[in-house]
């Protein structure tokens, strides 16, 4: 639907004290409570598809979430750069990092496990998956299906990220 022209915002703080503010326009809310320098950030993707060069800007059709909003541009980077940028945001800026991923194929909800080897397709079906990420993206066998946030990272002695703490919705 159409976004509200103004709204009242109410919340309880960490001490369970009730607060209310408004009427606020969306812009007033952003300026008062968010005031984040969004123009200082860039959206990164790791898309190793044929014909999608690294260090170039791309858009993704049907991925915008604001009618008549700005086109979102993504900088396609290699995986090492992607991981290092996310780690730097967490370690150097104390900022969580939003990310989108494909959880539909390798997720076992009952176990709460997201792992590339959660299912043994070779044992069950007698086949193995040999397509790489780029091929899976090219054939729409893989796509962003879920969003989560990196909230922590372990760094090895060389400064490289080794494992991530993920906050799921």
Spans of features found by a protein language model:
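Long non-globular sequence segments
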Residues: 1-169
């Amino acid at each position: 639907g159409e976004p509200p022209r103004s709204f009242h915002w109410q919340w309880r703080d960490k001490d369970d004290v009730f607060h209310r503010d408004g009427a606020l326009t969306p812009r007033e809310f952003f300026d008062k409570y968010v005031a984040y320098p969004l123009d200082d950030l860039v959206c990164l993707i790791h898309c190793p598809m044929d014909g999608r060069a690294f260090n170039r800007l791309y858009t993704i059709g049907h991925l915008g979430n604001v009618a008549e909003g700005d086109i979102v541009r993504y900088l396609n980077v290699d995986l090492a750069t992607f991981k290092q940028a996310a780690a730097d945001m967490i370690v150097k800026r104390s900022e969580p990092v939003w990310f989108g991923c494909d959880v539909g194929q390798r997720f076992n909800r009952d176990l709460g496990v997201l792992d590339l080897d959660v299912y043994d397709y070779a044992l069950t079906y007698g086949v193995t998956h040999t397509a790489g990420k780029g091929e899976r993206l090219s054939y729409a066998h893989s796509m962003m299906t879920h969003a989560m946030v990196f909230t922590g990272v372990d760094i090895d002695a060389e400064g490289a990220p080794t494992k991530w703490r993920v906050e799921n919705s």
